[in-house]
Swiss-Prot record:
Its main location: membrane. GO terms for cellular component: cell outer membrane. This is Outer membrane protein assembly factor BamC. A lipid is attached at residue 25 (S-diacylglycerol cysteine). It comes from Photorhabdus asymbiotica subsp. asymbiotica (strain ATCC 43949 / 3105-77). The keyword Glycoprotein does not apply. The gene is bamC. InterPro entries: BamC, BamC_C, NlpB/DapX. Part of the outer membrane protein assembly complex, which is involved in assembly and insertion of beta-barrel proteins into the outer membrane. Keywords: Cell outer membrane, Lipoprotein, Membrane, Palmitate, Signal. A lipid is attached at residue 25 (N-palmitoyl cysteine). It is a lipid-anchor. It comes from the Bacteria. One of its GO terms (biological process) is protein insertion into membrane.
Length: 349
């Protein structure tokens, strides 16, 4: 019995020690960049000559153990970073990575699974809240605004801007992340090690986000409808123009808020049972319409009611102004192209 109690106490102590160690590691990660775990070595007293009392005879000096005076020119303290370079992770099926000072790349097979990579990348950035300063969807290239990295192993957070692009080759797709700016505390940083580190970190966040989207799609059969939705022009029984989306009502209902916000329509009240959504439309800038690859629609800014109809495996969309007037045929056809692009660029949300 005494032996069992002693073993139980040992296990409890070991468990408490492990918990304290994990808690310490999770709260303070600065040890990752410190020599010997802390900066106590900076407080070591300097060497000085031995003060021999008068009358004491010292043994003969042996130079074998002398420590010659040196002047250190290397980095010390917080200036010295012992962290290894960050590496991009090849989490996606059939992928591999390449890292260089200029950029971090993910190379994938040119397969149907990777055909929506650009929209998936945009979804990751949207969910992270990263703002875009430049976008060219036609060439699948964008430049982010400044992104602040809150990391526990940095005393002062870094801010970065990145150029993210996708290049299609015969049998390969290349996702590239390059540096467009790096600063810390308002000061520009040109250290190639830090540039490569944050390129790899950004690429890893994109890869992890895309991987989560694909895992969600594989776990949920209905999620396969997260891809682009086909939108066509049509008319109701009275001949008024409307849009036809080739997807079931439930899918369209869930996808609409993100698509509407994408084109400048702020979503208000929603009623799933009646299929109605109120929106307040404010047009995007010329550059934003251009980045979407569509022309600015001619509808007026203001409040609209969007009526969604259930057509079994399809859905109908009809916009009605606050004065109760439906769109003209021209306006309806313009929104067909706009919403088709919006559904494509918000796929996965």
């Amino acid at each position: 019995m005494a032996i069992l109690l002693q073993k139980s106490k040992v296990m409890k102590i070991a468990g408490m020690s492990l918990a304290m160690l994990l808690a310490a590691c999770s709260s303070d990660q600065s040890y990752k960049r410190q020599v010997n775990g802390d900066y106590a070595y900076l407080e070591a007293p300097p060497l000085k000559a031995l003060n021999v009392p008068a009358g004491m005879i010292l043994p003969l000096q042996n130079g074998e153990y002398d420590i010659p005076p040196t002047i250190s020119k290397g980095l010390i303290g917080k200036e010295l970073d012992i962290r290894p370079p960050s590496q991009a992770l090849a989490l996606l099926s059939g992928s591999r990575t390449e890292n260089s000072i200029k950029s971090s790349k993910l190379l994938l097979e040119n397969t149907p699974e990777n055909s929506n990579l650009w929209s998936q990348i945009n979804n990751v950035l949207l969910k992270k809240g990263d703002k875009i300063s430049q976008r060219d969807d036609a060439n699948q290239t964008l430049v982010t605004d400044w992104i602040e990295w809150q990391r526990t192993d940095e005393d002062v957070p870094y801010q970065t801007r990145h150029r993210i692009s996708i290049a299609h080759q015969n049998y390969q797709i290349e996702l590239s992340v390059a540096n467009e700016g790096l600063r810390q505390g308002g000061q520009q940083v040109t250290d190639p090690v830090e540039i490569q580190r944050y390129n790899a970190l950004m690429l890893n966040e994109l890869i992890e986000g895309v991987n989560r989207q694909r895992e969600r799609m594989s776990d949920n059969p209905a999620a396969h409808n997260l891809g682009p939705l086909d939108v066509q022009s049509g008319g109701d029984t009275s001949g008024l123009p409307q849009m036809i989306v080739r997807a079931p009502y439930n899918i369209v209902w869930d996808r609409l808020p993100a698509a509407l916000e994408k084109v400048g329509m702020k979503v208000g009240n929603r009623s799933r049972s009646t299929g109605s959504i109120t929106v307040a439309y404010k047009s995007l800038s010329t550059s934003e319409w251009k980045s979407m690859g569509v022309n600015e629609p001619s509808i007026s800014e203001g409040d609209y009611k969007l009526q969604i109809g259930d057509l079994n495996n399809r859905s109908s969309l009809q916009f009605i102004s606050d004065k109760g007037k439906p769109l003209t045929q021209v306006q309806n056809d313009e929104l067909v192209a706009v919403l088709k692009a919006a559904f494509s660029q918000t796929a996965g949300l």
